[in-house]
Amino acid sequence: MGQKVHPNGVRLGITKTWHSTWYANNKDFSDNLGNDFKVRHFLMQKLSKALVSRIIIERPAKSIRVTVYTARPGLIIGKKGEDIEKLRKNIARISGVPTQLNIAEVRKPELDAKLLADNIASQLERRVVFRRAMKRVVQNAMRLGAKGIKVEVSGRLSGAEIARTEWYREGRVPLHTLRADIDYSLSEARTTYGIIGIKVWVFKGEILGDVLLLNTGYSSDQTINNSSKKKHKTRI
């Protein structure tokens, strides 16, 4: 029986970058790794309504730099920057080192797999019919320039006694093409009938060298490092 490899993991170092980038010796590695998980868990809980796409963590010179990609930057920053300063202090307390917190806006949340999966999960928890939720997300993504999208939901759909899997696809989603920029994410909807899993694949275009042929939807350009010469960095 054929199985699918993780679309993000197979492209690491080719067209995708790691979400944590830092170097540590054997003594400090486990502490830094644990701190990364704590910081991410804290931010995902604290910013559950801010439509967070991903969190990038870097550790330059005994400090930590956290970049949060969100579709609602104003909700995180708060009035006169009060909320972001509280977040920065909490992250510094968790990590125990000086902290720099950056907020980056996701300009096209309709092309972000994480935000799309969370959107479908939210609709299912509000008892929206799953087919309607899937079709709405697919149509919005294709309208805003996606080359292809696939959405899959599995579980006790509409309260059925037997769990099943249903999917909907439009356009191209070439999972075997490593130069294809495939954004993949997984989310869960906690309904009264149990947990429903949601998987989303978004094909944004092809990457030739360091040039992405379709806008990724982020406000800042993300450089793609195809070189394997930087051995002094530990990527997670």
From Swiss-Prot:
InterPro entries: KH_dom, KH_dom-like_a/b, KH_dom_type_2, KH_sf_prok-type, Ribosomal_S3_C_sf, Ribosomal_uS3_bac-typ, Ribosomal_uS3_C, Ribosomal_uS3_CS
Annotated GO biological process: translation
UniProt keyword terms in alphabetical order: Ribonucleoprotein, Ribosomal protein, RNA-binding, rRNA-binding
A Pfam match: KH_2
GO terms under cellular component: cytosolic small ribosomal subunit
SUPFAM superfamilies assigned: Prokaryotic type KH domain (KH-domain type II), Ribosomal protein S3 C-terminal domain
Domain KH type-2 per the UniProt entry, residue ranges: 39-107
GO molecular function, one term: rRNA binding
SMART domains: KH (SM00322)
Assembly description: Part of the 30S ribosomal subunit. Forms a tight complex with proteins S10 and S14.
Protein family membership: Belongs to the universal ribosomal protein uS3 family.
Primary role: Binds the lower part of the 30S subunit head. Binds mRNA in the 70S ribosome, positioning it for translation.
Protein's name according to its UniProt entry: Small ribosomal subunit protein uS3
Gene: rpsC
